[in-house]
Amino acid sequence: MVTLGLDASTTCVGYAFTENERILDMGFIDIKKQKTPKEKVFKVLEILNNISYINNIDKINIEDNLSGFAGGRTSQQVIVKLAKFNAILCFVLEDTFEIEVKNINPMTARKCVFGKARIKGIKAKEFVKMKVEQMYDTSKWCKETTRGNWDKRNIDMYDGLVMSLYEKKA
């Protein structure tokens, strides 16, 4: 059973394909250059459609886009823009693949995958990076910047992986 996990923002979409907790493929899609939500969604679809595992997916999990804004540091405009993009992306994915897209709270997914959602004093992104790298050798999928540094967009890929590994305990 192949699961596609996604972490979508309006500039970058992290994705991961997993089967039985094994990573098949993962990466991130830079959509900064696309102007409209429609262009961004179709860019994501174009890239995903070129990945061989796309025809085998039977689950799609996407990070719930409004969960991370409890701190109040994000403007309403940004939240609305992200919600609009996520809604369009989910609709197009469901329509294209005829699979229900599940919106998953990132804290719930982390707790399920790692046994805990966070560690006090460690930022969520650092926690995810640390835990994913303890579980897997991700070196073949991680990208570097032109200066040879770890590309921070890899974290979106890691978040996509957490979504892909999430399995609701019935």
Model-derived features: positions:
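Phosphate- and other anionic-substrate recognition elements at nucleic-acid/protein interfaces
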Residues: 1-170
